[in-house]
């Protein structure tokens, strides 16, 4: 494997001799950023048996002593890197103050957006005036047709969601997708759940909605609140649950315009679509069709006035952070403090950086990469990605449950994976995004409108395979099945995930598992529905499909049994894709690591073998503390399992982990060999 040397400490250079008689000593090799070889040994609780509770064995000392910052709802390796990314971007913004940017440049737009965000006095001075035009338009609605015009406008809340993506039937072109939308709380369970906690959330939401109506000067805030919540509860009743939304086949319903009118007749699409800039579009993909058809009927069964109150509330709530402090505080109190347990608001500059990421993120990313991303890191990651792909290819050859016909298709798909590392080869053009100094509210909305118009303009054009769905300064990675691409932004390519000076086992267990995770998504419960071109196509034989489903059912049961809070258990079906990515990624990374050794034994370092260091690194990148409300929110809304599950359950299904730590029958984490899930 080519990557073994690249993952080791880079070669050292000799200093020039100080004198002919006495040569200077050789420079020390660069050291790992964390510990002596890339692992935080002080975080471990060695009083815990690894076979009883591996996550706490690796992270227990840290978990016992860590104090959650008041402005955080969770904190771990991802969060620490996100803090660093924010600080790096903030430093860029501070540098811009010393050199006025060129007129019309991306830098000027960034500066004007950020300065407008930071000028709280100007925001307070404008009061609710920026909302007046929207509230007047909403108040003027009298008929269902008026409502349809409003909900067709992407600037207003709507039970009809729109997004544009490559077409699952032909991924070389774009298609308009129509999906369920319109709730003020995260998902349907917050409206329909039966527990004291859900009752408390609903009461807090009622308080929040009432506060917003008071702030916009509504004549009857309490009555208006009742109308909004009643309407949203009816909408929640017809929404699909998150696990249903993962069904690729059920959410792929291609229709032409006539078929759309028949499928969802309560909407006058000839009125709705032109308002969204889609008047000429003839073909669509409908996602949750029953939720959409039943939700649209509420336009007939609910009074026009109830919808007007709904729209008025949401135009204020959705833009609360661009309005005076009273709006911002109310939004924080409910969405951050009540729903996720955050004690205090984050510093305004940090939220300003977050705002810029959402509106002009690639423009900021170009500046970020130029200053903070070493070109050599991209080359090293490119090689590591190639190593993981080779490891996946080796694993595909030996999968006993997969027949040859399906294996050939899987190999073909793996061979066409398109990895992107660091940053895009071309940067987004923000010329059409107009930013005016001193107008935060308008600038934020203009940014959203710019992005929607940019997407609409792509309809009828070939799919742009060079486009990125994340900014370089984002600490994350993703797989897109419609283009068969895996993407690793620059910001995640730092310790503890990637450190060219760390022990190779650490890099393979950390960033290697992340790379493998994204590759694994190409073959998870959703990704396996797409072929090597990104088209939805069944390339599985019935026999292999049955064996896959048998294994995934066993895997789901392991996560169903993971209950981090009383009455709060992971939904193994909802989190299946991410769980499969975690297991497959760890398996691939381990295979790549062993291949990199070329048949030799890894050295023992600080008493740990290479295999042990590999698994320790994986569990340590998932080290995280999280508040109870945030954890409950994650289980309900996020297809990723909690960190403690991600850093322990995959290991329990790998024979190599048992061998590395001497885990045996009788240990609490032990799973009999016949019950271990063996997929990728």
Question: What does each model-identified segment do?
Answer:
Residues 30-35, 48-122, 185:
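Active-site-surrounding "flap" and adjacent substrate/cofactor-binding loops of secreted or lumenal enzymes
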Residues 28-30, 263-266, 285-289, 346, ...:
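Intrinsically disordered, low-complexity linker/terminal regions across diverse proteins
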Residues 23-40, 44:
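N-terminal low-complexity, Pro/Thr/Ser-rich intrinsically disordered segments
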Residues 19-21:
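Bacterial signal peptide processing site
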Residues 96-387:
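Noncatalytic, helix-rich "gating/capping" subdomain that lines the substrate-entry/channel surface
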Residues 14-17:
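C-terminal motif of bacterial Sec signal peptides marking the signal peptidase cleavage site
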Residues 55-63, 83-86, 90-98, 115-123, ...:
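Sec-exported extracytoplasmic/periplasmic mature domains
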Residues 1-7:
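Bacterial N-terminal signal peptides that target proteins for export
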């Amino acid at each position: 494997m080519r990557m073994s040397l690249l993952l080791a400490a880079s070669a050292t250079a000799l200093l020039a001799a100080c004198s002919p008689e006495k040569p200077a000593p050789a420079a020390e090799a660069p050291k790992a950023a964390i510990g002596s070889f890339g692992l935080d040994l002080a975080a471990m609780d060695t009083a815990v048996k690894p076979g009883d509770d591996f996550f706490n064995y690796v992270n227990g000392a840290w978990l016992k002593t860590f104090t959650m910052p008041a402005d955080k709802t969770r904190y771990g390796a991802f969060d620490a890197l996100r803090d660093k990314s924010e600080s790096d971007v903030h430093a860029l913004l501070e540098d811009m103050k010393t050199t006025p940017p060129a007129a019309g440049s991306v830098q000027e737009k960034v500066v004007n957006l950020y300065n407008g965000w930071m000028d709280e006095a100007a925001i307070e001075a404008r009061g609710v005036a920026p909302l007046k035009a929207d509230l007047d338009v909403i108040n003027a609605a009298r008929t269902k047709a008026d409502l349809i015009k409003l909900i067709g406008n992407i600037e207003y809340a709507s039970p009809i969601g729109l997004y544009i993506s490559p077409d699952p039937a032909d991924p070389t072109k774009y298609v308009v997708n129509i999906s369920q939308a319109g709730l003020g709380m995260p998902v349907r369970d917050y409206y329909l759940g039966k527990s004291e906690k859900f009752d408390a959330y609903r009461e807090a939401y009622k308080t929040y909605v009432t506060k917003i109506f008071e702030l916009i000067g509504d004549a009857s805030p309490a009555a208006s609140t009742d109308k909004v919540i009643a309407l949203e509860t009816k909408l929640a009743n017809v929404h699909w649950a998150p696990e249903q939304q993962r069904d690729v086949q059920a959410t792929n319903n291609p229709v032409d315009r006539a078929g759309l009118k028949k499928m969802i007749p309560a909407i006058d699409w000839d009125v709705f679509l032109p308002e969204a800039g889609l008047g000429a579009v003839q073909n669509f993909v409908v996602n949750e069709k029953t939720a959409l058809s039943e939700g649209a009927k509420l336009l007939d069964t609910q009074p026009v006035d109830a919808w007007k109150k709904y729209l008025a509330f949401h135009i204020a709530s959705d833009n609360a952070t661009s309005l005076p402090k009273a709006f911002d505080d109310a939004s924080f109190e409910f969405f951050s403090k009540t729903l996720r347990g955050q004690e205090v608001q984050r510093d305004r500059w940090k939220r300003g950086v977050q705002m810029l990421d959402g509106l002009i993120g690639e423009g900021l990313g170009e500046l970020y990469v130029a200053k903070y991303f070493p070109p050599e890191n991209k080359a090293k990651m490119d090689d590591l990605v190639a190593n993981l792909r080779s490891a996946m290819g080796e694993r595909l050859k030996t999968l006993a449950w997969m027949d040859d016909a399906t294996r050939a298709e899987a190999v073909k798909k793996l061979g066409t994976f398109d990895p992107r590392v660091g940053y895009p080869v071309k940067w987004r053009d923000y010329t059409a995004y107009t930013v005016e100094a001193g107008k935060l509210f308008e600038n934020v909305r203009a940014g959203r409108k710019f992005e929607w118009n940019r997407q609409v303009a792509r309809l009828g054009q070939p799919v742009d395979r060079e486009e990125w769905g994340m900014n370089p300064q984002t600490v994350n990675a993703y797989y897109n099945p419609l283009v068969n691409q895996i993407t690793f932004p620059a910001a995640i390519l730092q310790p503890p995930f990637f450190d060219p000076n760390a022990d190779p086992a650490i890099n393979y267990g950390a960033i290697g598992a992340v790379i493998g995770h994204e590759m694994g998504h190409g073959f998870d419960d959703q990704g396996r529905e797409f072929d090597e071109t990104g088209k939805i196509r069944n390339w599985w034989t019935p026999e292999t499909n049955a064996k896959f489903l048998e294994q995934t059912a066993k895997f789901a049961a392991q996560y169903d049994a993971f209950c981090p809070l009383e009455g709060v258990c992971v939904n193994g079906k909802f989190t299946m894709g991410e769980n499969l990515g975690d297991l497959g990624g760890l398996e691939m990374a381990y295979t790549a690591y062993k291949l990199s050794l070329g048949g030799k034994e890894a050295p023992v370092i600080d008493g740990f073998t290479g295999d042990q260091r590999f698994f320790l690194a994986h569990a340590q990148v998932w080290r995280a503390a999280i508040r109870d409300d945030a954890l409950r929110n994650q289980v309900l809304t996020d297809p990723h399992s909690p960190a403690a599950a991600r850093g322990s359950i995959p290991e329990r299904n790998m024979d190599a982990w048992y061998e590395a730590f001497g885990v045996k029958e009788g240990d609490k984490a032990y799973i009999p060999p016949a019950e271990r899930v063996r997929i990728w």
